[in-house]
Regions:
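Single conserved hydrophobic/aromatic residue that forms the stacking wall/gate
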Residues: 1-9
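Active-site helix-to-loop segments that bind/position phosphate- or nucleotide-bearing substrates
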Residues: 6, 22, 76-325
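Mixed-charge, polar/low-complexity N-terminal
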Residues: 12-14, 18-20, 49, 168, ...
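Short helix/loop capping segments that flank catalytic or ligand/cofactor-binding pockets
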Residues: 13, 41-42, 65-66, 197, ...
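A surface-exposed, charged beta-strand/loop segment in the N-terminal or early-internal portion
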Residues: 27-30, 34-109
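N-terminal ordered "arm"
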Residues: 10-36
Length: 325
């Protein structure tokens, strides 16, 4: 179903003659367009003038790109620092280790929280293995070794997470291209949205998203965005998806098979349920997750991007990630 979206005293976003949804301008801080959706020239100008990011996702939720206003504060000094770090595997290893440590810590916390609600699932073995892998990050001598530890942790983590979803949801393991079941379809779709959030936050912080620390720099992906989102994957996406599945707000009928039968994608109702849950998570206010900072999780992503910028440009700054219990 296609809607005409307009802003009070502003511009129509989609063509005339379609169902109409009205939203106050002050309530808009980002426009996400999914699939083959048009955006008028007037709407583009309004968004750019007001520093409203316009994010484009494919109909399957893959991040395609975005329009961003002139607020980008990328400086030559910061860009040079990023480039120098990206080309020095030895120099970027400590920050890469910190990124993976933060991710594994949050994976542990997600399992602990879900396990407390479902005593029938034994999380002891998985938690023990994750703690061992968490300690191993400090002994990784190369980025490749570190990525191997991260992969091992994710395998253990998703295996345990699969036991925490309802019996009518098939979730044997993490599958990506394409996702093979409802849980994986929801994770992939939400990760794509989170990637756009992180890319926008990095641009706002004056950083170049393609120059990564953990993920190798390339023109084909926003590597630093993937770095920033690592710790937020379990924190914001995984626990949201598990919560939606356990509360049956996301159900098997919300998934549909691809035309070639190779993958599973969310249908319109599934996307709405997921986006509603994701937005509720990002609008939740938290305090103490970052030193001296409080606000919504969305604001935490932006603040975390600024701190990541400090870690890149200030060698003595120790980046530790978000603290979440």
């Amino acid at each position: 179903e296609i809607y005409t979206l307009s802003l009070h005293d502003a511009l129509p976003i989609f063509g005339a003659g379609l169902p109409h949804v009205s939203i106050p301008r002050r309530a808009v801080n980002r426009i996400v367009l999914t699939g083959t959706v048009g955006l008028s020239a007037g709407a583009r100008s309004w968004a750019l003038y007001n520093d409203i990011d316009v994010v484009f996702l494919s109909r399957h939720g893959n991040y395609l790109g975005q329009l961003s206003g002139p607020r980008s504060t990328t400086s030559a000094r910061r860009l040079l620092a990023q480039a120098e770090l990206a080309e020095n595997d030895h120099a970027r290893l400590p920050l890469a280790q910190a990124i993976i440590r933060a991710k594994i810590r949050h994976q542990l916390n997600v399992i602990h929280r879900a396990g407390r609600r479902d005593r029938a699932v034994d999380i002891t073995t998985t938690c023990g293995l994750l703690r061992t892998l968490l300690a191993d990050t400090g002994h990784a001598g190369t980025i490749d070794e570190l990525m191997g530890i991260e992969g091992a942790a994710s395998t253990q983590y998703f295996s345990c997470l699969a036991a925490l979803v309802p019996d009518d949801v098939t979730f044997p393991r993490r599958s990506r291209r394409p996702p093979k079941d409802l849980a994986n379809a929801a994770l992939s779709y939400a990760y794509a949205i989170l990637l756009s959030e992180c890319t926008g936050a990095l641009i706002a912080a004056g950083l170049e998203p393609s120059l990564g620390v953990l993920h190798a720099s390339t023109d084909k992906r926003p590597s630093l965005s993937l770095d920033l989102m690592e710790e937020f994957r379990p924190l914001l996406v995984d626990r949201t998806v598990v919560s939606l599945l356990r509360s049956h707000r996301l159900r098997p009928e919300h998934a549909t098979a691809s035309e070639d039968g190779e993958g599973i994608w969310l249908n319109r109702e599934g996307k709405k349920a997921l986006v509603d849950g994701y937005e509720a998570t990002l609008q939740r206010r938290v305090k103490g997750a970052l030193p001296g900072f409080s606000g919504t999780w969305r604001r935490h992503i932006h603040h975390a991007a600024q701190l990541l910028g400090r870690a890149i440009t200030e060698p003595d700054y120790e980046w530790t990630g978000v603290s979440w219990r």
